[in-house]
Structures are given as structure tokens and as C-alpha cells.
């Protein structure tokens, strides 16, 4: 009798631990969010977005994008992001209501790093400091050029490859 009870308790414990492990794996799978961007009208933009999605905190999916005449746009968090390609050049514009928007740093950082993977988070942080503290409106990071423009809707960050 004790042997049966012990076996039943062990089976119950194994069942509970297997169930708990299975459900936690589903919740923690970061790859589930990061699907390849496909079916865009523009191969350069598709390639860039797939590079961006590899490490971005806020990945962009094909369904998020609205395409029109060589450009695409979407919402990333509370920011409007517009991608424009011309010849071999890519321009990314990020519209924010406030320069201090906490999402702005993360999204712009990920967009810049996707454009030039040799840049570091620290270099991007220095750029933001330059814009916020020094009042600069343009910043050159080698292959990537950034501009900041104030407009009626807040601020527009423009990121271009050189």
C-alpha cells in the first residue's frame, strides 16, 4: 500500500513538473515574435528590416507596414517610422511627440545599429546626448548620418546611410 502511494506521488510530481516546464518555455520563446519580413515591394528595405528584427527590442512584422510609392511606414511603440529608399540609399524617419520619449532612444538605437552593425550602443547614446544637451541638429557616425528636426508634431529623427 505504501509502495502504491509513493509511486502515485512520484507520478503526480513528475506530471506537474513536466507541465510547468512546458508552459514556461512557451512564454519565454523570443523567436516566436521575430519572423522574417517578406513580400515587400523593395528588396533593400526587406533586407534592412530583417537585419533590424534580429536584435530589436520592438520587431516590425510585414503586416505592420503600409507600403506606398517606394516607401513604407508603421508604428513602433508610440512612434511613427517611415522608410524611404532611392537608388542604393535608405532613409529612416522617426516621428516623436517629445524628445524625451523613453521609446525614442531604444527604437532609434536599434534602427541605427541595423544600418551599421559596427556602431555601439555607447556611440548612439553619445549622439542622443549631443542632440539633447548640446542642441546639435546633425550627427555623423561614419556610414550613418542622423538629423533632428523640430516640427509641428514634435520631433523628427532622420537616419540615413552614406
Residue ranges and their predicted role:
Residues 16-20:
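C-terminal motif of bacterial Sec signal peptides marking the signal peptidase cleavage site
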Residues 79, 84-132:
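Long, charged/polar, surface-exposed segments that mediate recognition or autoinhibition
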Residues 31-56:
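Intrinsically disordered, low-complexity regions enriched in acidic/Ser/Thr/Pro/Gln residues
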Residues 22-25:
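Bacterial signal peptide processing site
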Residues 54-68, 117-143:
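Short glycine-rich, low-complexity/disordered patches
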Residues 6-15:
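Hydrophobic helical h-region of N-terminal Sec-dependent signal peptides
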Residues 63-102, 138-162:
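Amphipathic N-proximal alpha-helical interface segments
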Residues 1-5:
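Positively charged n-region of N-terminal signal peptides that target proteins for export
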